[in-house]
Amino acid sequence: MIRKAFVMQVNPDAHEEYQRRHNPIWPELEAVLKSHGVHNYAIYLDKARNLLFAMVEIESEERWNAVASTDVCQRWWKYMTDVMPANPDNSPVSSELQEVFYLP
């Protein structure tokens, strides 16, 4: 399993809405993530800094990257653009983090 972590931002007035939209996520999005080898995906909110910290385990980078081209992912990204900064393709602005410690 490959562990990944990344940070995103959420608009200051959208914390509750962001959480509402994820509980639960669309069943079809969950199905796409699972079918693409995504496991143990968690997102945490730092309210003071409007930061989202995400951790995920994936089976392969290729399958993880393929999620972005699915119709359901494209619709999800568009759905989320009013609650968080987005790139021109509607993907969330994010920065990948480097793992510096892991205790199995």
Swiss-Prot record:
Keywords (A to Z) from UniProt: Carbohydrate metabolism, Cytoplasm, Isomerase, Rhamnose metabolism
Major site of localization recorded for this protein: cytoplasm
Domain of life: Bacteria
Subcellular location: Cytoplasm
Enzyme category, top tier: isomerase
Molecular functions (GO terms): L-rhamnose mutarotase activity
Gene3D superfamilies: 3.30.70.100
E.C. numbers: 5.1.3.32
Pfam families to which the protein is assigned, alphabetical: rhaM
The UniProt record lists the keyword Isomerase: yes
Protein's pathway: Carbohydrate metabolism; L-rhamnose metabolism
Gene Ontology CC terms: cytoplasm
Annotated binding of substrate, by residue: 18, 41, 76-77
Catalytic activity: alpha-L-rhamnose = beta-L-rhamnose
Keyword presence, Isomerase: yes
An annotated GO BP: rhamnose catabolic process
Residue numbers annotated as active site: 22 (proton donor)
Known function: Involved in the anomeric conversion of L-rhamnose.
Similarity comment: Belongs to the rhamnose mutarotase family.
NCBIfam families: YiiL_rotase (TIGR02625)
Subunit structure: Homodimer.
Name assigned to this protein: L-rhamnose mutarotase
Source organism (scientific name): Shigella flexneri
